Design a protein with these regions (language model features):
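A late C-terminal transmembrane helix in Major Facilitator Superfamily
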Residues: 346-383
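Cytoplasmic helix-loop-helix junction between adjacent transmembrane helices
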Residues: 121-159
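Helix-loop-helix hairpin linking two adjacent transmembrane segments in secondary transporters
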Residues: 154-203
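C-terminal transmembrane helical hairpin of 12-TM major facilitator-type secondary transporters
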Residues: 294-339
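Conserved MFS/SLC helix-loop-helix module at the cytosolic interface between two early adjacent transmembrane helices
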Residues: 77-113
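Helix-breaking motifs and short loop linkers at transmembrane-helix boundaries and internal kinks
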Residues: 58, 90, 111-117, 145, ...
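Intracellular juxtamembrane helix-capping segments at the cytosolic ends
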Residues: 131-144, 333-347
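Extracytoplasmic gate region of multi-pass secondary transporters
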Residues: 46-47, 229-282, 340
Length: 413
């Protein structure tokens, strides 16, 4: 088949060094990192405040689980479209538009009048989040070249920090103001302010880095179909990990507050510890490369064990802090990066982009359905039994599927 080979770009880092000081570059990374941090804060604050939101809107537990994660539908759709949009409008406009978009819909969330309008507003935040994420990583990859791994690792650290601060600060704002709406006003306004600051300070040489390619060469490359058994097994397994994650993130704070009697602040703090664990992603990626693909099995067993303990009536606050942290380390700090690596190594190098899109679609598409189904099962079976199906069980099914994976045909590069 005829494909476009990877394009050769100018040495970006060397050119940038002559026009921007190291201090300025660090400042740009910090600014983008902070904008990415607000992305995570917006995601995580909603489930942390779900008990109060449900009370105000009269939502059932399944409806609450749905609106907590409905944004993932648009993350999948617009993440796929972000490449075309960046080509059409430029990274800078997509980056700023995404940041303003999800911040605006975060700001508008308290103006919802019922379940439908609330779900629509939360879904629309996913549009902005997807565009911002795509643009940030495109800018980082092009600007830093061979050092893109460290730069992207820094972004993941900011995301983990946001996943911690979102629920921790959000629940405290509710406690201080006696209103769950305060967090959405503060986070929304802050996000728009960061967008304005980014528009003023981020130079075109940063967002446009590497966009003057040499002439691409069309070369005949004989490749197999992307749909191999290994890709199917790893992508479905990654999707099952997504079911576990979105079930946990949508209703964990509701469980600790409603069933264990944690205060809203303590429930938010327990959920926020996931973010601290997620900040270990740069270590998890390195460790996964050292241990190899089969390290997935150990991590899946750890995830299943921690998931079981989280929802089985252990009322010690410090224990939930530890368990939620471990969930974050295992899920986002290790399994997310390991599965993305395994999926990419399941196909020809020219098909990596398509394989990654398939994997991310599997991971994110379960979001709204996982939260809703978990809530329905809780109403029918109770928290302990429902969590076996939705949080602890999926990683064990993934163990079975990955045992069928043919590692002898997986690429080692």
């Amino acid at each position: 088949m005829v494909t476009d080979q990877a394009v050769t770009y100018r040495p970006i880092v060397e050119e940038a060094a002559s026009s921007s000081s190291t201090r300025r570059t660090i400042g740009l990374v910090l600014l983008l990192g902070i904008s990415y941090m607000f992305n995570a804060m917006d995601r995580q604050v909603f489930p942390a405040l779900l008990a109060s939101i449900r009370a105000d809107y009269g939502l059932t537990l399944p409806q609450g689980g749905f609106v907590s994660t409905v944004f993932t539908i648009n993350v999948v759709i617009f993440a796929a479209l972000s490449g075309w949009l960046m080509t059409r409008f430029g990274r800078r406009h997509v980056l700023l538009g995404g940041l303003v978009g999800y911040s605006l819909f975060t700001l508008l969330t308290p103006f919802a009048t019922g379940f439908v309008s609330l779900a629509i507003l939360r879904a629309l935040t996913g549009v902005g989040e997807a565009l911002q994420i795509g643009a940030i990583f495109a800018c980082m990859g092009a600007y830093f070249g061979a050092r893109r791994g460290a730069a992207m690792g820094a972004m993941q650290t900011f995301f983990g920090l946001g996943a911690f601060l979102g629920p921790v600060l959000g629940t405290r704002l509710e406690s201080w103001t006696n209103s769950w709406s305060a967090s959405f006003y503060v986070y929304g306004i802050a996000g728009i302010a960061v967008a304005v600051l980014a528009a003023v300070t981020i130079p075109l040489e940063f967002t446009n880095a590497g966009q003057s390619p040499s002439v691409a060469q069309n070369v005949d490359v004989q490749t197999k179909s992307i749909w191999t058994r290994n890709l199917a097994l790893s992508a479905i397994s990654f999707g099952l990990v997504g079911v576990s994650f979105f079930s946990y993130s949508s209703l964990y704070a509701s469980y600790t507050h409603g069933m264990l009697g944690f205060s809203v602040v303590d429930a938010g703090s327990a959920l926020g510890m996931y973010g601290i664990g997620a900040m270990c992603g740069f270590v998890g990626g390195w460790l996964g490369d050292k241990l190899g693909n089969k390290s997935i099995f150990g991590a899946l067993f750890v995830l299943a064990t921690v998931s079981y303990l989280l929802f089985h009536d252990m009322a010690l606050f410090w224990l939930h802090l530890l368990l939620s942290f471990t969930f974050g380390v295992t899920m986002s700090g290790f399994l997310f990066t390991r599965f993305m690596s395994v999926v990419q190594r399941s196909v020809h190098p020219s098909q990596i982009g398509h394989a990654g899109a398939v994997a991310l679609a599997g991971f994110y598409l379960s979001g709204p359905f996982a939260g809703y189904l978990f809530g329905k099962l809780v109403e029918t079976l109770g928290w302990s039994s429902a969590s076996l199906f939705m949080v602890a069980g999926p990683p064990l099914v993934a163990v079975v599927l990955m045992s069928l994976y043919d590692y002898s045909t997986s690429r080692n590069d």
